[in-house]
Amino acid sequence: MVNPTTQPTSAAPARDGASPRPLRGMAPSPARARSAAERSAEAAQGLSIVVPLHNEAASIARLHARLVEVARTLGANRALACEVVYVDDGSGDDTLAVARALPATTLDVQVVSLSRNFGKEAALLAGLDHARFGAVLFIDGDGQHPTAMIETLVGHWLDGGYDVVFTAKAHRANESLTRRLAVKMFYALVNWGARTKIPEDASDFRLLSPRAADAVRNLPERNRFFKGLSSWIGFRQIRIDYQPEERADGRTTWNLRSLIGLSIDGLTAFSVAPLRIATMLGLLLALTAFIYGGQIVFETLVYGERVPGYPSLFVGVMVLGGVQLIMLGVVGEYIGKILYEIKGRPVYFVAEHALKPREEAKQTESDNRTAAE
């Protein structure tokens, strides 16, 4: 559920060209579908494909070749102009050099190099800010998001009238039990008591219509959680299940530490559940202490028994001290986010930006000029 008036329609993977079907328990979105004329006008604005990169020198050429074919297909079947925006997020390898050399055959190529590693959320925003066309599609640079699905996502946007077409993992059978439990705990916590739910297992591989892209782009906060924000904006949304492909080149730059950091940032940027849990835990401990204190008074007055003091006092102080420090850390995370917002620093800085127009467009322009002469 995105909000009380707009819900995403969830769909199972299409088979043999069939359109996705709504899953049970998910109501279709009541938001008004855009007319054919509106969708045609949006298609004329084109499609920007944003690819955040961090140490992906080994995989970017293969991914670009796939995107070139996708752009050729979309241009032939839907007359859709495309561009790709590569955002180098402070890579330590040759990612930037490889990106600069990529050919612009069937689509324009932008290369945006950030001044340092600002993180994936900043890279996504940088790509969104530099996107020149109307709709924006986000795809990871490691090649694990299936580019063959891009045409399906575009179809739901143009033919189905959806504003947010997001993908989610069909299953996690190939992942460890610990990771699966951690993912479930994260989504349970971030969605607990939230008015806007983030679809479980949703990925950053998604397409935003022009108005959805503008909505996300214009949100003022600097602590951004892309999955949450693209759900929060509402509009008509649909889920498409997919299974990540095996990584063909290089190795992942994500480790346990970075995943935990991303989870904490997403949780504190989009949910107040930890603060509510702290309040409930404080009330529970206070109630427990009150009951235990009442029991001590009762036993002392009625039975005249002396309750052993030191062990129980020591354990109680240690438990309360540990809980207080944990809750202080939770509050500190939110205060840190507030401080970051108040400072008003830019989310990122651009060190280098280059635009390479597609060769097919230049050739067509040259042919037209020659014919006119």
For the regions a language model picked out, list residue spans one by one.
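Hydrophobic helical membrane-anchoring modules
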Residues: 2-16, 20-44, 225-373
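Structured catalytic core of nucleotide-sugar glycosyltransferases
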Residues: 2-16, 20-175
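Residues in soluble alpha-helical coiled-coils and helical-bundle/repeat scaffolds
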Residues: 55-58, 144, 217, 221, ...
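Generic recognition of well-ordered alpha-helical segments
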Residues: 62-65, 69, 97, 184-187, ...
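Conserved amphipathic alpha-helical interaction elements at protein-protein interfaces in regulatory
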Residues: 69, 73, 101, 105, ...
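Acceptor/aglycone-binding surface of glycosyltransferases and processive sugar-polymer synthases
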Residues: 110-116, 120-130, 144-229, 245-264
